[in-house]
From Swiss-Prot:
This is Ribonuclease HII. The keyword Transcription regulation does not apply. GO terms for cellular component: cytoplasm; ribonuclease H2 complex. Gene3D superfamilies: Ribonuclease H-like superfamily/Ribonuclease H. It comes from Burkholderia lata (strain ATCC 17760 / DSM 23089 / LMG 22485 / NCIMB 9086 / R18194 / 383). Its EC number is 3.1.26.4. Its cofactor is Mn(2+); Mg(2+). It catalyses: Endonucleolytic cleavage to 5'-phosphomonoester. Residues 26-214 form the RNase H type-2 domain. One of its GO terms (molecular function) is RNA-DNA hybrid ribonuclease activity. Manganese or magnesium. Binds 1 divalent metal ion per monomer in the absence of substrate. May bind a second metal ion after substrate binding.
Length: 214
C-alpha cells in the first residue's frame, strides 16, 4: 500500500507549540475517507494538519463542492497544509476485512503517514480507528471542522482520479462517470460483462453479477 504525503519535515517544538486551532495545546489533524459505498475501487483516507499561518478559504464537505472547486482546493491544501497524507485500502483488503475495517485501516495509514506528529486526530463520523494518538469522532465533521473538510477533499479528489485511471483499463463500466457507485448504468454493465478485478466481491450487487455468469 502506498501513501501520498507532503515532503517530510519535522516541526520544531517552538513551531508545534505555536498552533492556534482554538486548542492551543494541541496539534490537530483532520481525517476523512472517500469510497465506502462504491462497488469498485479502493477506499481512500486522508489526514491533514492545517497551517494557521496560511488559511484556506472555502473549505467544506467535499460532497457539497463542485468538482472544479474541489480540484482548486486540493491544490491549495497540498501547497499550504503543514502536513498531509493520503492512503488507501485495496479491493482485496476490503473483501478480506469488510468495508468498515478497511476504512479504519486506510485512516490509520493516513495518520501514521503524517510528517508532523499530531496530538489529536479528529475523525469524521462516529467511529475512530485504533491510533497511537488520541482520537475523537465528530459526526458531520467534514462540514464543521476545517481540517476534516480538507481531508475529505484530498480523499475525494484522489479517489476520483484513481477511478478515472481504472476507466482507462476497464472502459465498459464507466468508472470515470460514477466513480464505482452502483448507478443504473454501472449495474447494467455488471450484468452484461460481469465484474472486473477492481470490483468488490464482498458487495451484494457484485456477487449477484458473478452468479449470473457462472
Amino acid at each position: 500500500m502506498t501513501a501520498v504525503r507532503a515532503p517530510r519535515r519535522r516541526a520544531s517544538s517552538d513551531e508545534q507549540g505555536g498552533f492556534d486551532f482554538s486548542r492551543p495545546d494541541e496539534i490537530v489533524c483532520g481525517v476523512d475517507e472517500a469510497g465506502r459505498g462504491p462497488l469498485a475501487g479502493p477506499v481512500v483516507a486522508a489526514a491533514v494538519i492545517l497551517d494557521p499561518a496560511q488559511p484556506i478559504d472555502g473549505l467544506d464537505d467535499s460532497k457539497a463542492l463542485s468538482a472544479k472547486k474541489r480540484d482548486a482546493l486540493y491544490e491549495l491544501i497540498v501547497a499550504r497544509s503543514l502536513s498531509y497524507c493520503v492512503a488507501s485500502a485495496s479491493v482485496d483488503e476490503i473483501d478480506t476485512l469488510n468495508i468498515l475495517h478497511a476504512t479504519m485501516l486506510a485512516m490509520k495509514r493516513a495518520v501514521e503517514g503524517l510528517s508532523v506528529l499530531p496530538t489529536l486526530a479528529q475523525i469524521d463520523g462516529n467511529r475512530c480507528p485504533t491510533l497511537t494518538v488520541r482520537a475523537e469522532a465528530i459526526v458531520s465533521g467534514d462540514a464543521l471542522v476545517p481540517s476534516i473538510s480538507a481531508a475529505s477533499i484530498l480523499a475525494k479528489v484522489t479517489r476520483d482520479r484513481m477511478l478515472v485511471d481504472l476507466h482507462e483499463r476497464f472502459p465498459v463500466y464507466g468508472f470515470n462517470v460514477h466513480a464505482g457507485y452502483g448507478t443504473a448504468k454501472h449495474l447494467a454493465a455488471l450484468r452484461e460483462h460481469g465484474p472486473c478485478e477492481a470490483h468488490r466481491r464482498s458487495f451484494a450487487p457484485v456477487r449477484a453479477a458473478l452468479d449470473l455468469i457462472r
